[in-house]
Swiss-Prot record:
UniProt superkingdom: Bacteria
Gene assigned in the entry: leuS
Stated name of the protein: Leucine--tRNA ligase
Reactions mediated catalytically: tRNA(Leu) + L-leucine + ATP = L-leucyl-tRNA(Leu) + AMP + diphosphate
CDD domains: Anticodon_Ia_Leu_BEm, LeuRS_core
Sequence motif 'HIGH' region, location on chain: 40-51
Motif ('KMSKS' region): 575-579
Gene Ontology CC annotations of this record: cytosol
Stored PANTHER family: LEUCINE--TRNA LIGASE, MITOCHONDRIAL, LEUCYL-TRNA SYNTHETASE
EC class of the enzyme, as a word: ligase
Length: 803
């Protein structure tokens, strides 16, 4: 018989809320466990079925850990600043604050309808001044330590959005959100010196329990390179410029130089004959993001400036080109090109007919660049040396001549930390008329966002806050006039430290109490989408390391264990989107099938990190299993089945203990699909048995409760319990009940599988051999033959050799 999910879901959600069931306990005798989801941006669309996948996973672990005797911190909040709310407000004339508040209410209602065990007393919202007071405080500490500074930097400017967007938010020369065109232009921006932490961010990765693919993405993003910086000179003007190379040993093979289109020397050295093509190329490059420019698979483009550089090692003249694959912001903005031994340089040289000169033996440079090691040739004092020795010798030569030195370079660049928008944290800085810049005093934080704002972009590149003269203009006690900083922080700011605030969300004196942080941090389990692999996780690690260095927090790393859930695709195997009409609303699923069915189905679809297509058939199957669980224990009158008894005849011992062991291990490993499979095995066995031991029924209910909490609470109460099973002790298993007295063995005859036998643990090898020879199928292949040899591989296989 089917259960009534509408009634049961609401009943237990009400019970949990009224009893503050999931408030974080702080029993000093218990160990602590911190399970965290990447908190969502509350969009206007509300939850889609992709959100609950990660949320259900952390909820299962949080619920199990409570039952295992842990204090569990499992909070939820809102990453609510950001462009989408502001764009909506601009399009509709509504204030983003109102819109965001409504969205949060929708998200919270939907989350609660799914029965997640969040401690709502710790709810945080990045747009709450009581929260962003501490975001501003962190900015002020960064500024005091020289890690926040202003600079003129080339940025991705979107005229339509009226703001700067990050490199990662530009795709094919357009903004990721909205598809608006982007141009590169220099602007005054606030920067955070994340590069100061490049080495720490790199080395500390080794100690984290993170997917190797994510760690590798961070390593690549930081992009550490060891090599040399070499000074070249423009041939006629003798203007010096530096290049960075990881292969200084190939300097004799350099046949041209490439500068970034933005390099400061380009306009100085371009000849009149080349000026027009150079200007056109520079303009074209300004419309591309750094990511587009450096894509490995893109065709190389470039133009010659008409100028030459002198190779410092042999005096040869090298043509100076510009190409957009060289970035002004990486290294020195200029590279030496050795086409014989670099694939990208080779493709460029072939395309533009530039000389290719081999300096390492091996390969055929008429066909391809040779990038392997080998003996140096055509290289003067390096001839006959291998790569390692030649690099050392060349660096010594450069240092002796004063024209170069060993250098470590990072691809990582400082973080552009300002946005020309209204809906973000105000940057607590005042620019005074005498040129001084000061911070807003700490005791005046938070510097709040003015409520009634004309939030249209100013059009000048400044934030809409620039229009609010009453807010912008300030006078100090000595009559000195100043203007507030009108740029706001990016959406990444609030999410770079929120995991710390959850530990102590109501603290008015500090971002969080040091001892409480010591008790809870780092986060034990952090689950979210792989799309945050680089930025959010890198920024959060940077802020955490900085706060650790200044003694504000006790832990270096924020997230000990990270897991990325896969993407739930539409039933047509494409990404869910409104335009494709394949979005599934969780409200509809909960209404038709119940919250527990949605939770169970999403965990049973496949491995948690796999991308899997949504299936209504699979959803119906999940519901059918829950109905089978219900009817295994509850009769048609809604009463406990008579066969639930305190007597245990031992017939379910093995399957029950196997189930407890497997489910416990699988929950810890986040292998929820296989845990569910094992629970299905138990239910199938239980339904066939005349007597169900009460202990095993209760143990099973506890095991399924983290996945299907509403239905299991209902069965638990009908088993006679007057308290919730939130803190009911997790079941244990008896290893001796899992061990069996028999095991299966395969039988091979002359190397081919011909049958199997069931052997007793006490049987001797001779008895096993006799049983194998007596097998009906084996006898077909041994009849009339001499048995030359029988080999018993214990507990695995019997090999019979017959001639």
């Amino acid at each position: 018989m089917a259960y009534d999910h509408h009634e049961i879901d609401k009943k237990w959600q009400r019970y949990w809320a009224e009893h503050n069931e999931f408030n974080t306990t702080t029993d000093p005798k218990k160990p602590n466990y911190y399970a965290l989801d990447m908190f969502p941006y509350p969009s206007g669309q509300g939850l889609h079925v992709g959100h609950p996948e990660g949320y259900t996973a952390t909820d299962i672990v949080a619920r199990m850990k409570r039952m295992q005797g842990f204090n569990v911190l499992h909070p939820m909040g809102w990453d609510a600043f950001g462009l989408p709310a502001e764009q909506y407000a601009l399009n509709t004339g509504h204030n983003p604050k109102t819109f965001t508040k409504q969205n949060i209410e929708t998200f919270k209602r939907q989350i609660n309808s799914l029965g997640f065990s969040y401690d709502w007393n710790r709810e945080i919202n990045t747009t709450d001044p009581n929260y962003y007071k501490w975001t501003q405080w962190i900015f002020e500490q960064l500024y005091k330590h020289g890690l926040a500074y202003e600079a003129e930097v080339p940025v991705n400017w979107s005229p339509d959005l009226g703001t700067v967007v990050a490199n990662e938010e530009v795709i094919d020369g357009k903004t990721e959100r909205g598809g608006f065109p982007v141009v590169r232009k220099p602007m005054r921006q606030w920067m955070l010196k994340i590069t100061a932490y490049a080495e720490k961010l790199l080395t500390d990765l080794d100690d984290l329990d993170w997917p190797e693919s994510i760690k590798q993405m961070q390593r690549n993003w930081i992009g550490k390179s060891t090599g040399a910086q070499i000074t070249f000179r423009v041939t006629d003007s003798h203007e010096p410029f530096d290049v960075f190379t990881t292969r200084p040993d190939t300097l004799f093979g350099a046949t041209y130089v490439v500068m970034a289109p933005e390099h400061e020397l380009v306009q100085k050295i371009t000849t009149p004959a080349q000026q027009a093509v150079v200007d056109a190329y520079i303009d074209e490059a300004a419309h591309k993001s750094d990511l587009d420019r450096t894509a490995l698979d893109k065709e190389k483009t470039g133009v010659w400036t008409g100028a030459y550089a002198t190779n410092p090692v042999n005096g040869e003249k090298l043509p100076i080109w510009i190409s957009d694959y060289v970035l002004a912001s990486y290294g020195t903005g200029a590279i030496m090109s050795v086409p014989a031994h670099d694939d990208r340089d080779y493709a460029f040289a072939k395309k533009f007919g530039i000389e290719i000169k081999p300096v390492i033996e091996g390969g055929n440079v008429d066909e391809a660049a040779y990038t392997g090691d080998g003996v140096h040739i055509n290289s003067g004092f390096l001839d006959g040396l291998n790569e390692h020795d030649a690099i050392d010798r060349m660096i010594k030569w450069l240092e002796d001549k004063g024209i170069g030195s060993a250098k470590i370079n990072y691809k990582l660049r400082d973080w552009v930390f300002s946005r020309q928008r209204y809906w973000g944290e105000p940057i607590p800085v005042i620019h005074w008329e005498d040129g001084e810049t000061t911070l807003v005093p700490e005791d005046e934080l938070p510097l709040t966002l003015p409520e009634e704002a004309d939030i249209k972009p100013s059009g000048t590149g400044e934030s809409p806050l620039a229009n609010l003269t009453d807010w912008v203009n300030v006078v100090d006690k000595n009559g000195r006039k100043g203007k507030r900083e009108t740029n706001t922080m990016p959406q990444w700011a609030g999410s770079s430290w929120y995991f710390l605030r959850f530990v102590d969300p109501h603290n008015k004196e500090a971002l969080a109490d040091y001892d409480k942080l010591k008790a809870w941090m780092p986060v034990d389990l952090y689950i979210g989408g792989a799309e945050h692999a680089v930025l959010h996780l890198l920024y959060a690690r940077f802020w955490n390391l900085f706060l650790y260095d200044i003694g504000a927090i006790p832990n270096k790393e924020p997230f000990q264990r990270l897991f990325n859930q896969g993407m739930i695709l539409g039933d047509n195997h494409e990404k869910m989107s409104k335009s494709k009409g394949n979005v599934v609303n969780p409200d509809d699923v909960v209404d038709e099938y119940g919250a527990d069915t949605l939770r169970l189905y999403e965990m049973f679809m496949g491995p948690l990190d796999a991308g899997i297509a949504w299936s209504t058939k699979g959803l119906a199957g999940a519901r059918k299993f829950l109905d089978r669980v219900w009817s295994a224990f509850i009769d048609d009158e809604g009463k406990l089945r008579d066969r639930i008894t305190t007597i245990n005849d031992g017939r379910l011992d093995k399957v029950y203990n196997e189930t407890v062991k497997k489910v416990t291990e699988d929950y810890d490993a986040l292998h929820f699909n296989t845990a569910i499979s094992q629970m299905m095995v138990f239910i199938n066995s239980a339904r066939k048995d005349d007597d169900l031991p009460l202990e095993y029924v209760e143990g099973f209910v506890k095991m399924l409760a983290p996945i299907a909490p509403h239905l299991m609470e209902e069965i638990w109460s009908r088993l006679g319990h007057d308290h919730s099973l939130t803190y009911a002790p997790w079941p244990s298993y008896d290893e001796s009940k899992i061990k069996t007295d028999t095991y299966d063995m395969m039988i091979q005859v002359n190397g081919k599988l011909r049958g199997s036998i069931t052997a007793d643990v006490n049987e001797s090898d001779d008895e096993i051999k006799q049983a194998a020879l007596a097998n009906d199928n084996v006898q077909k292949f041994t009849a009339g033959k001499d048995i030359k040899k029988i080999i018993v591989v214990p507990r695995k296989i019997v090999n019979i050799v017959a001639k």
